Every structure is written in C-alpha cells, then in structure tokens.
Amino acid sequence: MADIQLSKYHVSKDIGFLLEPLQDVLPDYFEPWNRLAKSLPELVASHKFRDAVKEMPLLDQSKLAGYRQKRLAHLQLVLITSGYLWQEGEGGAVQRLPECVSKPLWNVSNDLGLKPVLTFADICLTNCKVKNGDIEVMYNLPGGAGTEWFLKVCGLVELAFGKSGQAIQNVLDGAKANDKAKMASGFTDLTAAIGNMQTALARMNENLTPEHFYNGVRPFLNGFGGPASPISGGLVYEGVSDKPVTMIGGSAAQSSTMQVLDGLLGITHSPEKQAFLDEIRNYMPPSHKQMLADLTNMPRKVPQVVAETKDANLTKAFNGCVAAFVQYRSYHIQVVTKYIVTASKSDSPKSLAYKDTGKSDLIPFLKEVRDDTEKVQQ
Ligand code: HEM
C-alpha cells in the first residue's frame, strides 16, 4: 500500500482543496486588477467593462509575492477575461484578448501550472473563503445574488468534503497498516461527509433558478475553440502568440472531490469516460492532479484490502460509503437535469466542459459514471 499523506498535496484536513483564507486584494501596484475584478458585475451590466479593460495598464506579474498572491491574481485575471469576452453574450464574443490581460495571465498561469482560463480552482477554491464555518464569496461574476449563490454552494460542497480529510487519511493509513478498525471508522466518517455534500448541493435550490444558471451564469464559464464554442476558432492571447488557443469551459466537474472518491474507493470507468475525467485534471492545480494520479495508481487498491480481510464490519462500512457516493452522484444528475437539460429547453443543451470535448451524451455519461460507482459494492 502506497503512503499517501494529504498534506503532501496541499490538501487540508479541515477545508480540503479550498485555499486557506487570503487577502481579498493584491498590493497597491496591482490596484487596476483589484478594481476591475471587483467592479466586473456592474461594469458588464452597463456594457462598459470591455472599454475599461482596454484602458488597463500592462502590469508586471513578477512583482507578485508567493503562491497565494499568484492564485488571487489568477482569479482576478480570469474573471477579467471572462467579463471581457462575454460582456455582449455568446453572440457578441470577441476572439482576441488584449495584452494587458493576456500576458500577465499567461505568465502567472505558467508559474502556477494552471491553465490561462477560468477554472473551478479560481471561482471556487480561491474565491470561497471559509469564515466561521460558512463560505464567503470574494469576487462575483455578473448576475447578482443568484450567481453569488451558485459560487457559494460550490464552496459549501467543497467544505463539506474538506472536513472528511481525516477520514480519508484514516482509510489510507488503515489500509497500509492492515488496521481494520481504523479503515472502518474512516469509511463511516466519510459516509457522513458525503451525505453532508449532498445536503450542501441541495441548497442550490434555495436561491438559484434554472433560467438564471443556464442563461446568466453558464455563458460566463464558456471555454473557447471547438465546434460547440461561440469562439470556435479559439482565442488569441495578444502579446503571447498569434496562434489561437483552445480551452475547455469552467465547470464544477473540475472539482477533485469525486475523483478522489473514485481513486480511494477503487472505482474505475471505461477508457472513453476516463479520458474526459483525465482531461479535466489538466484544469486542476498540479498538486491536486498529482494526488489523483497517486490514488489511481495505488498498487493495492482499497476494495482489495477490504475483500482480503473478510471482515463483516469493515465490508459493511465500505459498502455504506459506496452507497452514499452512488446516491450523491444520482442527486447530482438531478441537479444537472434541472439546471441544464430542462433549462435549455432544447434537445442539445449547452453543457459546461463536456460539450467542449465534442460530446453531447451528457446524462448517459453521468449515469454510466454513477453505475460504475455501484459496481465496487461487495
Ligand atoms: C448548478 C449546479 C451544477 C450543475 C448545473 C452541474 C453540471 C455539471 C455538468 C454539465 C457536468 C458534466 C461535465 C461538464 O460538462 O462540465 C458535471 C459534472 C461534474 N460535476 Fe457538476 N454541476 C453542478 C454542481 C456541482 C457541484 C457543486 C460540484 C462539486 C463541488 C460538482 C461536481 C461535478 C463533478 C466532480 C463532475 C464530474 C462527473 C462525476 O464525477 O460524476 N457539480 N456537472
């Protein structure tokens, strides 16, 4: 059994993949980025954002100090990119990003190993601050309270998962040491955490309507390049290269939570489905991607360890955890049906990242992934 320690991957045992709270703003030198990122919702609503971006000075990102400042800068710059591209809706997108955004975004992305595009790591993991057990959203996309609620609930799901850090570590350590009781207690706690993730996800209904998500939030998460994209030829990052670049859209599918559970519980998918999930990993912070690779490549998988013990208690705890995960994935399919399939009022809904890989069988894909989960029951 490999030795996997969460801390090695910058994953907290209290808040998981969320970034530890950081300053809301960058130092004074970066005030133009602070200002534009904060005023994005109002300036997009009044159609003044693009002009404001064009007037922004070209700043030197090498003046950013340390990892967390760079993550905040990345968040600000991808928000500015999103507002700039989609201010006039999907029909009025532009195909070139001005140098004052593209150059520092490109460079800071290279430093961080992140893609130069809006990702879940930005709008959720960096943007959602844990405060007194709740989530506070620092920067908003256009759309007011409904959009902020979407971002907040994503943060609440991550936080619910994040609290299972010790449980996950107990499963891994217990498996390594053949400690049945430790593993069983890990599974039991993890089952509760997955239930809490579902409770958090259900809160989407409180303040987000399907129409608002589909028409108000989703367009700002669009990627570029590929037949399904409003910018089908890709985006030119001025001052970086004249060759258009292709990126898939931002999506909570870029959350590492479900892929961690897949790796931990030994759930496998067909090569075609795994190819999409692997592609998604390229849009995660490198240390999280590494954790998924190490979990996936564990030589002795957790279900194998459980089976070998022939221990009824442990098997029951493992199966309970798998059942909770199946239920969570089923619930997530209901959410996708409500917010994307029904809201689109069409046979070919514009999904998030999945459509950018040229596929349209969204619900069958999610159902198969859910059914693969069930198969590891013992
Ligand atoms: C309004 C709420 C949501 C909608 C409309 C939604 C939509 C989608 C869609 C369309 C996909 C397919 C891949 C894609 O096209 O991007 C997907 C997959 C996925 N979503 Fe969501 N999602 C929502 C909330 C969440 C939240 C809050 C999380 C976790 C924080 C999450 C985690 C995932 C994961 C991990 C996948 C990959 C498939 C899997 O492993 O089962 N989603 N979602």
From Swiss-Prot:
Keywords in alphabetical order: Heme, Iron, Metal-binding, Oxygen transport, Transport
GO MF: heme binding; indoleamine 2,3-dioxygenase activity; metal ion binding; oxygen carrier activity; tryptophan 2,3-dioxygenase activity
Keyword Metal-binding: yes
Pfam family, one: IDO
Cofactor: heme
One GO term (biological process): L-tryptophan catabolic process to kynurenine
UniProt-annotated binding residues for heme: 332
Cofactor note: Binds 1 heme group per subunit.
Any Gene Ontology CC annotation: cytoplasm
Gene3D superfamilies the UniProt entry points to: 1.20.58.480
Matches recorded under InterPro entries: Indolamine_dOase (IPR000898), Trp/Indoleamine_2_3_dOase-like (IPR037217)
Keyword hit for Ion transport: no
Stated role: Serves a reserve supply of oxygen and facilitates the movement of oxygen within muscles.
PANTHER family (UniProt xref): INDOLEAMINE 2,3-DIOXYGENASE (PTHR28657:SF5)
Quaternary organization: Homodimer.
Family: Belongs to the indoleamine 2,3-dioxygenase family.
This protein's name: Myoglobin
Organism annotation: Haliotis madaka (Giant abalone)
